[in-house]
Amino acid sequence: MKKIILSFSLISSMSVFSQEHFSGISTSKRGGLLSAANNPAELANMTTKYEVNVFNFSVAMANNKLSISDLTSDDNIEDKLFEGNDPVNLRLDTQFFGPSFAFKKGKWGFGLNSSAYLKANVVNVDAKLGEAISNGELSNLFTQTSLSSNENQRLNATTWGELSFNVARNIMDSPKHKINVGTNIRLLFPGAYANFSASNLNGTLVNNFGDISLINASANINISYAGVLANDFSDKSNYNEFFSQGINGYAFDLGFNYRLKDENDANSYKLNTGLSIKNLGAMTFKSDNNLNKNYSLNIDGIESLDINQFENVQSMEEIEAILNDPANAGILQTTSSSADLKIKLPTVINVYADLRLHKKWFVTGTINQKISDDTKSDLTTTQNSYSLIPRFSSGWFEAYAPLAANEISGFTSGIGFRLAGFFIGSNSVFSALASDGKQADLYLGVRFGF
């Protein structure tokens, strides 16, 4: 278990992130496939007849405990991660957009995208419980620590691939106004999944000179996995399976776009706004080792659960073996067990407005608001984010400086550039380097239109 928790932390620290991917470039005046991933209606605003996406890549991490200086210092990451009383929250999110193509025909825009996703999360984990599992000790003395949480504490990871069909249509185009609608139809290819969670955990951790046990406790526990993520969590190659289970899910995005045109400049606008609802769908994992099992934990009297037995666990299968150990039969009862594993995507509302201030100067405001409770064990996770992005935009060059806030790591600031079809940026490079920022990210890509 120690290695599982640290694997999430180290993978996230090596592959660092902000939840709002491609911030700045996805609302660029240039438009195209990246803008359509943000809002499918934007595909009708393509500035070229054809667009080819070679690759786009975004990798990012946000957390509420570890700063960039912590990761580069000689201090023990475990100690920093479980320091204080606030629950530990960490989000890793990686997106790969592979070869993709889009074209315009009359009032229509069409696109075909290939993509792959990795998410790994630590959600609302009690710091003292995490310290006990990770370190195997709360101190060298005899201590008792109360645990009381109404949250669903989770360790969770998901990989999957997608093939997306994009359709947009212009439904109004006057000298001053333009309105588009669109949809993304996404075929989902589950890769691998793992979840270990404990909801409504109440009890007492007892440390008897390094022997940690849980007494007088109750909780609802879920363990579920599919594919290679049932195996060693510290093996990063297990996070590379994206299309292994074929088409076993569907999702949809819906979008609306309004543009106040600039009558004196056909290549620009005064205002561009959009509203999209994303991730309406779910996927079903169908690997041979599928498991979705729920337990009821009830410990009273002289009974206890030995926490030390989780210390060196490296896989979900090992955790399941401990939970099913006859020695724990009196305190852990199976309430349901199934091979069915259906995981929902986190539905998000995306709203943005891009205002032209003067000639080539713009400012964009965006809101990404989740409308699903992603603390539930059958959902992948996301987070709310808000950004303000001043931008200079010419035909072949753009520079922008995202200022953002999200619910996990707080305020961030970064910078990005586009030179013809190549772009590179970070939503948080300034805040990460100038202070104890708890978020970092990088994205880049190559695309061209003709």
Residue ranges, per PLM feature:
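Subset of outer-membrane beta-barrel
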Residues: 19-450
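Sec/Tat signal peptide C-region and signal peptidase I cleavage site
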Residues: 14-18
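Sec-dependent N-terminal signal peptides
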Residues: 4-13
